[in-house]
Amino acid sequence: MKKGITNGKANGLFGSNDSCTRAQIVTFLWRAAGSPAPKGTAKVPADVLPGSYCYDAVAWALENGIINGLADGTFGVNNTCTRGQSVTFLYRAMGTAPTTVNGFTDVAADSFCADAVAWAVENGVTNGTSATTFSPNNGCTRAQIVTFLYRA
């Protein structure tokens, strides 16, 4: 919060155990990158309203290949960000190709997040939820996301 990457919620609380939405993580990444102005080249999905807190962040992330929209054409502003999505966004924003292969039984080699998971574990961003599982479809809390950002 000191660096302005995240904000608290109402009543002076951070909401550590609250689910982190896709809009929130992208906004955190955008702020960590210095809040660069988008170039105006991205087709921003209709569920990201102009003037909303995340509009510029989503536009920037789309322009830089950090995120994609969902299959239904939306961004999923209020959807909970999963572990697989969160490490993928971080990897695309900050990562370099991993030198190892992820060894988790629940992350297939052809999964959208396979390289990102390997990168995140290799670089100490996060671990699996057990020795053999990563749980890529589990939601992330705000505390987990800011921890991932700090470690990345």
Stretch-by-stretch model annotation:
Residues K2-K3, N7-V26, W30-D56, E63-G84, ...:
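Feature responds to low-complexity, polar/acidic, surface-exposed segments characteristic
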Residues A116-N123:
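Short glycine/proline-rich, acidic loop/turn segments that cap or connect secondary-structure elements
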